[in-house]
Amino acid sequence: MKILVVGSGGREHAIIRALKKSPKAETIYALPGNGGIAADAICVEGSATDIDRVVSFSKDNGIDFVVVAPDNPLVLGMVDALNEAGIATFGPRANAAILEGSKVFSKNLMKKYGIPTARYETFDDAHAAVAYIEKMNEYPVVIKADGLALGKGVIIAQNFAEAQDAVKSIMEDKAFGASGNHIVVEQFLEGVEVSVLAFTDSKTVKPMISSMDHKRANDNDEGPNTGGMGTIAPNPYYTDVIAAECMEKIFLPTIRAMEQEGRPFKGCLYFGLMLTKNGPYVIEYNCRFGDPETQVVLPLLESDLLEIMLATYHETLADMEIRWSDKSAACVILASGGYPVKYQTGYEIHGLDADGQCEGAVVYHAGTKQSDGKYLTAGGRVLGVTCTGDTLELALEAAYKAVKNISFTDMHYRHDIGKKALSPEKF
């Protein structure tokens, strides 16, 4: 089969590396891909949001299957356009991708169908939002931009002044553009965050191994929110008992709710959960593989990813048995200094071989490009260094050992990835 993966980050690199293992995967293309992906797939020029380009390339090159990985093209309707052109895909149509594309929609859906989520109100007027926050007088308070914001549209305000600034930044200063025309103001939940990605064909849900993301830029969960600075899998807080509760109260009800609304969801559905003393709650949905969660989850997958994705498209997921390794995985993100705010790019990356890899680890490329045989930084998050091990300690030890062999100007990474997972506190 000829496969096209749309996207250019570490997540896409991890998907491509997993797809490569399938006997059915004959040729893999990436549009646009990046410097490191070029070692594993044929990179094609174009933008990941250019629907016409993706459709025409797929038709002209006899592509059998397209994996649309990022949120933007999914929300814009890339899967709809490909399906209308008769091309099989992995990913939800636009009317289902709204689950991530609009936080107002997703919160209202959860409320309507009794899916546990934090108490909230939605606003399209900044003054009304500020008045509500002042009246509630509960801190911390969570303020979320309605639309897509590269994983950075959530602000946890510790007091009224911070909340006021957050509302102004999102709604008046348009920090996230039109994504901030509406906001959600919600109750802050205490607990432990868990990420669970799941394959679904709109009827059946097959959760993947759980993971723990580290969203803050700096050690000890300090600094601004990022797209993610590292992950570990599995998440030790996510027990079999909690998994069964999530399936019954969250995963299946979400899929059934979407079906009921005439928005059947096919693809990867990401559940961002908070495990509280009162049980699991949904913090957010994403309509695609998480980044960097994918970089620890897929290395633990023992089944054929392409077969699973095809079953998702053909709605035969119930017949699939998906096997997972009982090892642990850890991923440390190497970022450009100053990310996620202001950072410089174009620096040479040292310590990688000709294929962009490093001994003792798998290196997933995110913001990289190749020039004159060298790898250069080309984004905020540059590389994801992933290792597996018989225990989480061993996986983390190997990942940090590999990180020491890689360097570039202003390289920044967290030194405490997985620390919370090594000594899980019980609820």
Question: What residues fall within each predicted segment?
Answer:
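ATP-binding N-terminal substructure of ATP-dependent carboxylate-amine bond-forming enzymes
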Residues: M1-A94
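Solvent-exposed alpha-helices and their adjacent loops that cap or buttress functional pockets
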Residues: K21, G36-A38, D60, F90, ...
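Short acidic-hydrophobic, aromatic-tinged amphipathic segments that line or gate anion-handling sites
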Residues: C43-D50, E121-D125, A157
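A conserved helix-loop-beta module that forms one wall/lid of the active-site cleft
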Residues: F90-G153
